[in-house]
A protein has these predicted regions:
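Bacterial N-terminal signal peptides that target proteins for export
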Residues: 1-12, 16-22
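Noncatalytic, solvent-exposed loop/strand surfaces
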Residues: 22-167
Length: 167
């Protein structure tokens, strides 16, 4: 019971810290799923009020993300998402302006099940750290500038049991 309470308190402190840092994000940043306030509302100005014929001009595309269901987080000019390569789930960093691949780090093994393979979560960026959880429960914290993994845990380390659809 004490161990579970300790884990819960640690998790609550992490969420509290991340939430505090997110409120100080740059206006153009979208550092977590659904945006800074998790409302899906952008504070950007000068956005298109209607789509031009044929849609807006495509600026870039990226085709090396592999499988998965991750959305995107954007902070300090870098777009982060999760995908798969070489049998592993990975955290991918791209230049948000050009789409240039800035690198990737392994999060964990690929989650495979009847709902589709790959990660389900969206990275969160706070305080210079990118937090990413793979479908199998691996959670990493990586430096947002260098990609160096600061720490890595798995939910099973804390008694977590993988849901049928994954984390």
């Amino acid at each position: 019971m004490t161990k579970r309470l300790s884990i819960l308190i640690t998790a609550l402190l992490l969420v509290s810290t991340v939430s505090t840092v997110l409120t100080k994000a740059q206006a153009a940043d979208w550092p977590t799923w659904r945006g800074t306030d998790r409302t899906d509302i952008s504070t950007e100005k000068g956005l298109l009020q209607s789509w031009p014929e044929g849609g807006p001009k495509q600026l870039w595309t990226f085709k090396n993300a592999g499988k998965g269901y991750s959305s995107f987080a954007i902070a300090n000019g870098t777009l982060y998402t999760l995908g798969t390569r070489d049998g592993k789930e990975i955290l991918i960093a791209l230049d948000a302006e050009t789409g240039k691949d800035k690198g990737a780090v392994v999060v964990g093994d690929i989650l495979s099940n009847n709902w589709g393979d790959g990660p389900r979560g969206t990275p969160t960026v706070a305080g210079g750290i990118v937090y990413a959880m793979g479908g199998g429960g691996s959670l990493i914290a990586a430096d947002s500038q260098t990609g160096v993994v600061k720490w890595k845990v798995n939910m099973s380390d804390f008694g977590g049991k993988k849901p049928g659809w994954g984390y």
